[in-house]
Amino acid sequence: MAAASVTSPGSLELLQPGFSKTLLGTRLEAKYLCSACKNILRRPFQAQCGHRYCSFCLTSILSSGPQNCAACVYEGLYEEGISILESSSAFPDNAARREVESLPAVCPNDGCTWKGTLKEYESCHEGLCPFLLTECPACKGLVRLSEKEHHTEQECPKRSLSCQHCRAPCSHVDLEVHYEVCPKFPLTCDGCGKKKIPRETFQDHVRACSKCRVLCRFHTVGCSEMVETENLQDHELQRLREHLALLLSSFLEAQASPGTLNQVGPELLQRCQILEQKIATFENIVCVLNREVERVAVTAEACSRQHRLDQDKIEALSNKVQQLERSIGLKDLAMADLEQKVSELEVSTYDGVFIWKISDFTRKRQEAVAGRTPAIFSPAFYTSRYGYKMCLRVYLNGDGTGRGTHLSLFFVVMKGPNDALLQWPFNQKVTLMLLDHNNREHVIDAFRPDVTSSSFQRPVSDMNIASGCPLFCPVSKMEAKNSYVRDDAIFIKAIVDLTGL
């Protein structure tokens, strides 16, 4: 893997775990998955044990201090002192990030046809897809982002409204229930047909309306007819004999039990007086409450308007925060790229000779055998300050015909800032060496580029296809003679012939 400076995971923290697996439009490879959340890596960090984690996941794990790597434990690869997750030894895996961000992606939201790369999805589409399902804060239902405003204003059953009659605040779902008790709700008189009579004055209208049907005054003694107010006198004249008969019958019944009447009469009179006093008191209270209800309704309407304004402000601020978070995330990525470039510049050479030290050889070899990190790229080096840009690629467990038996070493022509000034195809002799620490038996291989190969044409992407030696050095030779591996490190040297440049 390309060398990188060790940076705290917190510096790239975007408070988001890995990408959903449903984003990939191609078959998913295990190397792209976070060892913690098992989703696609987002801002990958590599621990010293070789496992990769999302920046968010690693920060969450390390929030309570250094931890054992659960992936090492699960895979049976735990090593004391190596399988430890800690901020000081984890570093941003920019090579893995570039691979992940270049993967083809499709939007997982139903109905959306967007396609692109993971990098484009994160920067331009994630969180902005019109088909994204979001939760309505009022009714808790799921609505598409593009329909959220219409839902909030027109369809949400919990949307805040004001009664059109009394202006009291009310949700849409409770509006019909409110109409049943609203003091300003318009009623229609069945007698005269007058409409839009407020409920609070309807009884006064009924008492005054000549067309309203009321009980006959003699209903207490047995007359059950309902008569219009204006015809009440005619009814009493027409039913005079019947009313007198009812009165006589009632009188005779009362006369038959005078003791009971004498006992009940004063008690009923007293109760009536008490009830009349209470009614008068309650009427005064109702008047006060009506005025208070009107005042509260006006206040509630003002609060409702202010609430809507506040909600609009909150939504606008929330959008700004999201934009700022996205902007900070992009700046963090740019900063990581700059850190990577500075780190590479510190070890770059400009004379065509490059010595690459690979530390932690034992661990990196185990990772290559396990398939977690099969290849490692060196920092870039140059033939001159304005010359060709190159790097090395090594497979510690071999590649192709050398897999499992040899160390494979390749030479890579990279896209440089001055390619337009250089001669193409690249045609300089390349010598590759595995250095013997005793300076006696260096493993050496050299080749002159095949100018017809695409590996040595002017690069159109970050780097050309690697070319070199899949059978560079047998693993058995390295293990049998400890002069190649010393202090758990090996040194690889590349020499580019500058003749003709």
Swiss-Prot record:
It is an enzyme of class 2 (transferase). It holds the Pfam family zf-C3HC4. The modification Phosphoserine is found at S5, S11. A zinc finger (TRAF-type) spans 124-180, 177-233. The modification N-acetylalanine is found at A2. Residues 351-496 form the MATH domain. Has very low E3 ubiquitin ligase activity in the absence of sphingosine-1-phosphate. E3 ubiquitin ligase activity is strongly activated by cytoplasmic sphingosine-1-phosphate. This is TNF receptor-associated factor 2.
